């Protein structure tokens, strides 16, 4: 019978994480459980940064971006001895189960605690990249999408004024959901996705044809890590004789007030994670599919499940050019 649970956020922060923490804390307290917050992720767990939460610990945070518990990269968690110490610290506080909010790396940590130490963990997908298997949306994705679209709108204003080609690099690592969605919503003339081999020559030829037809400015949305966008801008400008500039949105996409969707999603997932633990279901991760909350075996989600590439969305963007 679970009496005490803990919650931590790990990896990159995402708008809506605070709503998820709040959902965990308040629903667990309402069920008569004790709740502990672990500050600075797995790093904080290893250094025993554990504090008991009350309902007032999570007051006035639902509208705040980031995570008030903090987060930190902690590659040392790959060491079995480090994980053993973390499990020991959890048990020293009498904690029976753990909720982990984060991306794939955070899930891996929860998976190892479950596998190696029999510690019940539930993962909640929190990352702007929307690259976690087993869910249609991750917490933070919709807010980051809105941020990217607003940036594209602003770039279009200045690009049209100066007849300029603008390249905007959007986060996502190896998942192009953000770039594709922002590109469609922002009316980008070209979208470069990481799931499709980048053909630089083809892109430049497309731009040249557009200029011949009278196009005076353009926006190119590209997922990060595909190429050096500043170097690409220089090459395009040299080839097509049209001023070209690159903008890297970077970490601005992680910040800001979470949108209503992410606040609601985080709240729902936080409560659902507690429900699973109270039912004795540790070793799972939470998701939302077709607007319904679901859960999957966390080991299966990491090892066997893959996110589907939005190829039809990319095809749609080309028809809208």
UniProtKB/Swiss-Prot annotation:
Predominant subcellular localization, coarse grouping: cytoplasm
Highest rank taxon of the organism: Bacteria
Keyword Phosphoprotein: no
Reactions that this protein is recorded to catalyse: beta-D-fructose 6-phosphate + ATP = beta-D-fructose 1,6-bisphosphate + ADP + H(+)
Regulation of this protein's activity per its record: Allosterically activated by ADP and other diphosphonucleosides, and allosterically inhibited by phosphoenolpyruvate.
Assembly description: Homotetramer.
Protein name as annotated: ATP-dependent 6-phosphofructokinase
Cytoplasm keyword on record: yes
Pathway the protein acts in: Carbohydrate degradation; glycolysis; D-glyceraldehyde 3-phosphate and glycerone phosphate from D-glucose: step 3/4
One cellular component (GO) term of this entry: 6-phosphofructokinase complex
Summary of the function given for this chain in its UniProt record: Catalyzes the phosphorylation of D-fructose 6-phosphate to fructose 1,6-bisphosphate by ATP, the first committing step of glycolysis.
Chain positions recorded as ATP binding sites: 12, 73-74, 103-106
Keywords associated with the record: Allosteric enzyme, ATP-binding, Cytoplasm, Glycolysis, Kinase, Magnesium, Metal-binding, Nucleotide-binding, Transferase
The species this protein was found in: Pasteurella multocida (strain Pm70)
Cofactor (UniProt): Mg(2+)
Similarity section: Belongs to the phosphofructokinase type A (PFKA) family. ATP-dependent PFK group I subfamily. Prokaryotic clade 'B1' sub-subfamily.
């Amino acid at each position: 019978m679970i009496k005490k649970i803990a919650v931590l956020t790990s990896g990159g922060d995402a708008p809506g994480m605070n709503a998820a923490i709040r959902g965990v804390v308040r629903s667990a307290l309402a069920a008569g459980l004790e709740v502990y917050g672990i500050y600075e992720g797995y790093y904080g767990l290893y250094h025993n940064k554990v504090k008991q939460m009350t309902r007032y610990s999570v007051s006035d945070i639902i509208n705040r971006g980031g995570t008030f518990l903090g987060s930190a990269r902690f590659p040392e968690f790959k060491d079995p001895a480090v994980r053993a110490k973390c499990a020991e610290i959890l048990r020293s506080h009498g904690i029976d189960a753990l909720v982990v909010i984060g991306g794939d790396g955070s899930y891996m940590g929860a998976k190892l605690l479950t596998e190696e130490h029999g510690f019940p963990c539930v993962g909640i997908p929190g990352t702007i990249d929307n690259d976690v298997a087993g869910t249609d949306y991750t917490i933070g994705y919709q807010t980051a999408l809105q941020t990217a679209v607003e940036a594209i709108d602003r770039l279009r204003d200045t690009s049209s004024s100066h007849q300029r080609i603008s390249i905007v690099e959007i986060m996502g690592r190896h998942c192009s959901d953000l770039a594709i969605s922002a590109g469609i919503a922002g009316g980008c003339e070209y979208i470069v996705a990481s799931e499709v081999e980048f053909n630089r020559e083809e892109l430049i030829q497309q731009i040249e044809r557009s200029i011949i037809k009278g196009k005076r400015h353009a926006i190119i949305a590209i997922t990060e890590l595909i190429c050096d966008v500043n170097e690409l801008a220089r090459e395009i400008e040299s080839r097509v004789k049209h001023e070209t500039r690159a903008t890297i949105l970077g970490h601005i996409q992680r910040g800001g007030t979470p949108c209503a969707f992410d606040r609601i999603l985080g709240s729902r997932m936080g409560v659902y994670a507690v429900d699973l633990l109270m039912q004795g279901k540790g070793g799972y991760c939470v998701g939302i599919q077709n607007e319904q909350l679901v859960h999957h075996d966390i080991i299966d989600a990491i090892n066997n499940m893959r996110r589907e590439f939005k190829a039809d969305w990319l095809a749609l963007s080309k028809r809208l050019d």
